[in-house]
């Protein structure tokens, strides 16, 4: 039975055209399993499931008169947020994070998000395109195998790409290519003068690319596609996956600048199930394919670069980026033990990005063993979703609050509430897996 400390929420979803189609989408599977009265249209994309207090796509408390989570929080902020969270984040109406599931069939826009200072400046100058004054750090956790772009490639790889791919060389110009290749200094300690100069050179290259006329991009795209067909070996020493990737993304966004700034300049990241990456403010990134759990600060501020028909703010984009140039492996997040979670789970690990708004706890039970896990009360609100398997969830020691939790079910947990997860080991063909987004202060 629901209580005001633990209750199930029905979450809204988005049918953006980049989403996976029909029941191939994890979002669609979760939506239907959570509410079988919702029929999945096998011709429509199901892109995002939103879990939180965002007014655009509200989550509703099923057993509390279908009130929105935002209305519940607004009515009783001390109970649902806690005084420390209200004080720290300055809002008594909303969670400081938005929790999502994304199912990606087609590439999303290459984008970056401002930090808090720039977010406030952009909002003041252009509230139409920048609707709030917050930053928007994000974390992506793979639910199925995932690929994306994240941050600029290491500079030695970029130098090799500029020297090897004639079409990119043609766009940037030989003079700037030579300046970049001869000017970068490696290794360079972060913050050193060599590092500062390296970033300035990278900014010049990226700025030149992003300010190239569309006609030139179209001409060079035709040549680049021909090269991926006739001379795929050209890309062997850079990344042997590039010919297929360029052709695939060109079918989705023909003649797009993203083929150059994404495929050739950014890290192509693959995540296996359970792996994660943190997307820092002012670093370029894009999601290409797969199903992910995503958590972000509550903001809609996006500065776009490519693979989009939407507004591209090239001037601010080129000026704002950090121009960090780390390897793929450094983009991935390390996992941490979570000592406040104890019991029979084979895995209970923390994804803890270097920002205040959110962390995510993953808990997995072996399908053949079942068992019970107790997670101590947290000093802030949280949202739990089951992505595989089934079991029960309850307030620790209070059997009257015990409820079924199945794949796609989502629950809100009030601050300070210790919860108990129990895996259903009978006829379970999947490991019972939950993700829990939370904030503490």
Swiss-Prot record:
Annotated catalysed reactions: D-mannose 6-phosphate = D-fructose 6-phosphate
Annotated transmembrane regions: none
Any Pfam family: PMI_typeI_C
UniProt GO BP: carbohydrate metabolic process; cell wall mannoprotein biosynthetic process; fungal-type cell wall organization; GDP-mannose biosynthetic process; protein glycosylation
Entry GO CC: cytosol
Molecular functions per Gene Ontology: mannose-6-phosphate isomerase activity; zinc ion binding
Cofactor note: Binds 1 zinc ion per subunit.
Residues reported to bind Zn(2+): 111, 113, 138, 285
Catalytic site positions: 304
Source species, domain of life: Eukaryota
Site feature location: Its modification inactivates the enzyme: 150
CDD domains found in the cross-reference section: cupin_PMI_type_I_N
Required co-factors: Zn(2+)
Keyword Magnesium: no
Localization per record: Cytoplasm
Pathway: Nucleotide-sugar biosynthesis; GDP-alpha-D-mannose biosynthesis; alpha-D-mannose 1-phosphate from D-fructose 6-phosphate: step 1/2
Family label: Belongs to the mannose-6-phosphate isomerase type 1 family.
Function: Involved in the synthesis of the GDP-mannose and dolichol-phosphate-mannose required for a number of critical mannosyl transfer reactions.
Cross-referenced PANTHER family: MANNOSE-6-PHOSPHATE ISOMERASE (PTHR10309:SF0)
NCBIfam families: manA
Name used for this protein in its record: Mannose-6-phosphate isomerase
Species lineage: Eukaryota, Fungi, Dikarya, Ascomycota, Saccharomycotina
């Amino acid at each position: 039975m629901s209580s005001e400390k633990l209750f199930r929420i029905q979450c809204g979803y988005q049918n953006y055209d980049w989403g996976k189609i029909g029941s191939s989408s994890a979002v669609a599977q979760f939506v239907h399993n959570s509410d079988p009265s919702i029929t999945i249209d096998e011709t429509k994309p199901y892109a995002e499931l939103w879990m939180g207090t965002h007014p655009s796509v509200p989550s509703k408390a099923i057993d509390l008169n279908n009130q929105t989570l935002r209305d519940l929080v607004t009515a009783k902020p001390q109970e649902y947020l806690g005084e420390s969270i209200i004080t720290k984040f300055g809002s008594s109406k909303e969670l400081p994070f938005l929790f999502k599931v994304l199912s990606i069939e087609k590439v999303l826009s290459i984008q970056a998000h401002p930090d808090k200072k720039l977010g406030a400046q952009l909002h003041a100058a252009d509230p139409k395109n920048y609707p709030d004054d917050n930053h928007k750090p994000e974390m992506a956790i793979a639910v199925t195998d995932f690929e994306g772009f994240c941050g600029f490639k290491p500079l030695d790889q970029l130098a090799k790409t500029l020297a090897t791919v004639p079409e990119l060389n043609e766009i940037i110009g030989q003079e700037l290519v030579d300046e970049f290749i001869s000017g970068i200094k490696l290794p360079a300690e972060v913050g050193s003068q060599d590092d500062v100069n390296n970033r300035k050179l990278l900014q010049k290259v990226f700025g030149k690319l992003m300010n190239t006329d569309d006609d030139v991009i179209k001409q060079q795209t035709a040549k680049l596609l021909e090269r991926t067909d006739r001379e795929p070996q050209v890309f062997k020493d850079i990344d042997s996956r590039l010919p297929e990737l360029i052709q695939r993304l060109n079918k989705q966004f023909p003649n797009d600048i993203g083929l150059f700034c994404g495929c050739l300049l950014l890290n192509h990241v693959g995540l296996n199930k359970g792996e994660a990456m943190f997307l820092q403010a002012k670093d370029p990134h894009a999601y290409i394919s797969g199903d992910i759990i995503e958590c972000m600060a509550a903001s809609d501020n996006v500065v776009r670069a490519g693979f989009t028909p939407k507004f591209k703010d090239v001037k601010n984009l080129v000026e704002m980026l950090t121009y960090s140039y780390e390897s793929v492996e450094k983009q991935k997040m390390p996992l941490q033990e979570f000592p406040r979670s104890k019991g029979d789970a084979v895995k209970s690990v923390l994804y803890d990005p270097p920002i205040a708004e959110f962390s995510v706890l993953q808990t997995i039970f072996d399908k053949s063993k079942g068992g019970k896990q107790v997670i101590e009360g947290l000093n802030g609100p949280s949202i739990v979703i089951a992505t595989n398997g089934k079991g029960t969830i309850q307030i620790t020691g209070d059997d009257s609050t015990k409820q079924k939790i199945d794949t796609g079910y989502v629950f809100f947990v009030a601050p300070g509430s210790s919860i108990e997860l129990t895996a259903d080991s009978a006829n379970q063909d999947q490991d019972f897996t939950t993700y829990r987004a939370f904030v503490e202060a």
